[in-house]
Design a protein with these regions (language model features):
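A short beta-strand element within beta-rich, extracytoplasmic domains
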Residues: 2-12
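Residue-level recognition of well-ordered beta-strand positions that form the cores
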Residues: 2-4, 19-21, 94-96
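Intrinsically disordered, low-complexity acidic/polar segments
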Residues: 8-10, 29, 102-104
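Extended, solvent-exposed segments with strong compositional bias
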Residues: 34-87, 103
């Protein structure tokens, strides 16, 4: 997913603590460095106002048996098994900026035809069946 902060106008130096929640459980936080408007986003439409944010940073969030990671760096000890999911479980994913964060710089989520990556949020869920007793 492509993310950035949300400043009045744009400001490349506008940090924001973006929290990731799974089923309303905080799984980690990443600090976006800014709200980028210095150059036009590769896929941002020409009709988009030039003084609005143009692009973000592509981030990969992984939750597995070892913890929660963003771009390969561990951001929390929350593990997938902490959720006790089964085949009937609903999964709700949320991004937010808390009012009590150190950096309350808002959040911009880019999708197809905006920013520098022509994609929506991509989600991959993989699982392993538990061993069977024979």
């Amino acid at each position: 997913m492509e993310l950035s902060s949300e400043a009045p106008g744009t400001n490349n130096d506008w940090p924001s603590d973006i929290a990731f929640l799974l089923n309303d459980t905080p799984i980690g936080t990443w600090t976006s460095p800014g709200d980028f408007g210095d150059i036009h986003g590769l896929f941002t439409p020409s009709w988009w106002f030039p003084y609005w944010n143009q692009y973000g940073l592509l981030k990969t969030l992984i939750l597995n048996k070892n913890g929660t990671f963003i771009d390969g760096l561990k951001i929390s000890d929350i593990r997938i098994q902490d959720f006790h999911f089964d085949y009937k479980s609903s999964i709700h994913f949320k991004l937010s900026v808390s009012e009590d964060s150190s950096n309350i710089g808002g959040l911009t989520l880019f999708g197809s035809n905006f920013g520098n990556y022509n994609q929506d949020i991509k989600v991959l869920v993989s699982y392993q069946l538990p061993p069977q007793d024979n």
